[in-house]
Amino acid sequence: MIISAASDYRAAAQARLPPFLFHYIDGGAYAEHTLRRNVSDLADVALRQRVLRNMSDLRLSTELFGETLAMPVALAPVGLTGMYARRGEVQAARAAAARGIPFTLSTVSVCPIEEVAPAIERPMWFQLYVLKDRGFMRNALERAKAAGVTTLVFTVDMPTPGARYRDAHSGMSGPNASLRRMLQAVTHPRWAWDVGLLGRPHDLGNISAYRGSPTGLQDYIGWLGANFDPSIAWKDLEWIREFWTGPMVIKGILDPEDARDAVRFGADGIVVSNHGGRQLDGVLSSARALPAIADAVKGELKILADSGIRSGLDVVRMLALGADAVLLGRAFVYALAAAGQAGVENLLTLIEKEMRVAMTLTGTHSIAEISADALSRVTRERAETISP
């Protein structure tokens, strides 16, 4: 298969993965309207082309939370990444480090913190959920500190799991799920050998280390489902802000008032995110929510954005809408599933090339210059229709 654009990796991943894994990463909540709008709304963002601007000197690097990034991109936390490639979190982290950007390890990763952190030279980020088991949360924070994690990404948009109907059809959940997954693995021998056999153990490393026993896929679903905490409020996060002395980012913000609450809480950054359309179907796409949030809190903390980003052009669009940086989730998992570390490195190379083209043709010499001025007048007027 010819890979000429970041989007090509999706088809490559689908060909390689058992359906339960492909649809788990590819799908969204309910009828998946928000999942689709994340992509389509971002594609509708029209940029303002400029010419004769002497674009011989482009600078993609940026500073974020005391780190220098080769470009304003980080790999997002994605659960079960180690099921998409052999020891997938390690491969993805190495790819990110090789391209000079951060990797964010998920709470529900296959590879534990202690396996991933020593595999790379640059510090990684760590994502944590709000869970009823505060002992687990404290244990995870202590281990992250000990491993040299610099930035904590705190996910707050999962007080309850989203209804992901596609999972029941694909075999991730639903009737006879274990049998269906086994049969799918048999019909995908490359994955079964490389990941299914050579990629063991497949337990949830961070959770297993705390529980003292292996945590397989079925155990994970039950444990996590029992630990979602719908009673959580801002006051319940105060002990974490006191415990964690490094940068702290609140992930899952879609409303300007919640963004202002994050500022009052003392967060160093937020991620404008609808969890990739995997939680509440029918909410705003990140691209539609971002301008009002940027109007409300820009300059008071760092604004990151995710959901729907499939190219370097999309990265520039998000920056023009008000983000300081973006997180890539599905896009890197597709590349990882298709070609491992090399696939993710190539994906990031493609993202960088596409950013350079977009910046050259919008007359923006550096990341700091990418602003609403890079948007077409029509797009600016549309963004202004959603007020904070």
Curated annotation (Swiss-Prot):
Enzyme class at the top of the EC tree: oxidoreductase
This enzyme's EC code(s): 1.1.-.-
Record-annotated active site: 275
Membrane topology type: Peripheral membrane protein
Subcellular location: Cell inner membrane
Reactions listed under catalytic activity: (S)-lactate + A = pyruvate + AH2
Ligand binding (FMN): 106, 127, 155, 251, 306-330
Chief subcellular location: membrane
GO BP, sorted A to Z: aerobic respiration; lactate metabolic process
Protein task: Catalyzes the conversion of L-lactate to pyruvate. Is coupled to the respiratory chain.
Family per record: Belongs to the FMN-dependent alpha-hydroxy acid dehydrogenase family.
Name the UniProt record assigns to this protein: L-lactate dehydrogenase
